[in-house]
Amino acid sequence: MTTTTELQSLQRLLTWASPAFPVGSFAYSAGLETAIADRRVKDAATARDWIEGNLLAGAARNDAILMAEACRAYLDEQRLQQLTDLCLALTPALERHQELAATGEAFVLAARAWAAQTCGRLPSPCPYPVAFGALAGACGISPEAMLLAYLTAYVQAQISVAIRLVPVGQTQGLTILAALEPLVAEKAKELSRATLDDLGSVAYAADIAAMAHETLSTRIFRS
């Protein structure tokens, strides 16, 4: 494991979690586009509720747990394969399965500049949570810091979807981001210590929206 200072960790996390990092995350909505089309999400209040629900009991929570496990198991190829299989098996919709696999593979390819050896022993396809977690572990980044960056990026991405599809304006989006900061920090700390026994989801509306997305007559996003 590479010894990494806090500032180095911050610098790397800012890079890896940036929308500019070439994983294509801007092309996916994780079912939010369906919720907007169905008018479940129609303004800033409902957008915040949707995002918060996924942080508390949805796919974002499970992805964070799997990411923390991968961070701790970055040297264990068998464990990483098990986490990969579990991550993909827990995905309720085809498009979400494709999203995790595609963004994960893109992340592995882009991240070789930091940890080529770790990237070389990851499963293929490697879903995004496992790829991000393993790379963070290999670079000596703590699970809590990693999850703070990941969950912040998740919230930002969901807000960006809502802004592009009009229900939320830019100022409202920033208000949501600021309001969710305490919850993101709380979940990063809590889930950094979580194990596979803590996996679970009751965000049924989000799962159904992800499944229904492929049948939308007009789609901007790939999930």
From Swiss-Prot:
Superkingdom to which the source organism belongs: Bacteria
InterPro entries: UreF (IPR002639), UreF_sf (IPR038277)
Pfam families per the UniProt record, alphabetical: UreF
GO CC, alphabetical: cytoplasm
The entry's keywords: Chaperone, Cytoplasm, Nickel insertion
Location(s) in or outside the cell: Cytoplasm
GO molecular function: nickel cation binding
Binding partners and assembly: UreD, UreF and UreG form a complex that acts as a GTP-hydrolysis-dependent molecular chaperone, activating the urease apoprotein by helping to assemble the nickel containing metallocenter of UreC. The UreE protein probably delivers the nickel.
Protein role: Required for maturation of urease via the functional incorporation of the urease nickel metallocenter.
Assigned protein family: Belongs to the UreF family.
Name the record gives this protein: Urease accessory protein UreF
Taxonomic source organism: Chelativorans sp. (strain BNC1)
Lineage: Bacteria, Pseudomonadati, Pseudomonadota, Alphaproteobacteria, Hyphomicrobiales
